[in-house]
Amino acid sequence: FKDDIITGVDSNIRKIDVQDKVDQLNNVLVKMFGISTTSNKKGEISEQLVYNMINDKYPNYSYDVKRHIAHHADGELTSPTGMKCLVEIKNYTHTVNKDEINKFKDDLKTTNNNLGIFISLQTNISGRRLIDYETYDDTHIIYISKIMEDCNKLDCGILLLESIYKLIKK
């Protein structure tokens, strides 16, 4: 009877040990490959996705990653026409709030840029339609919500920015 108890306890300890190792391995795999572990990694992957979309559709455009520079949004898009705009990309599971919009507006002021495109991959942007436009203090912003539902929205946004650029440079 005593041996059965010892064998049972020993077996449970080994199972716990194995389960602990499985959990540790799982945590390592999630950290290495999972995008849900940190918003920074998730943001990086989202920005790369949009960068690839721009690069594929607009090979003559230049996209400079700025996410590592404070108050410079995620990137700056430059077209062959000379149009430059800041790019902000959000990959939230909830509606992008107004604080994020205000931060982007501050980034536009800081960089002295008067054109911007604010993109949400999966969700709505607070107070905005799926494709929307705002102007304030001679600054023009195109908002695109749920771009992953229809990647052609990016074309609309860039065409709008190019049209605005032509109007304001006159």
Map each language-model feature to its residues.
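Extended, gly/pro-poor, charged amphipathic helical "stalk/hinge" elements that serve as dimerization
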Residues: 1-111, 118-119
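Domain-level recognition of nuclease-like catalytic cores that cleave nucleotide substrates
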Residues: 122-170
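Proline-centered loop/turn at the N-terminus of a beta-strand
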Residues: 114-115, 140
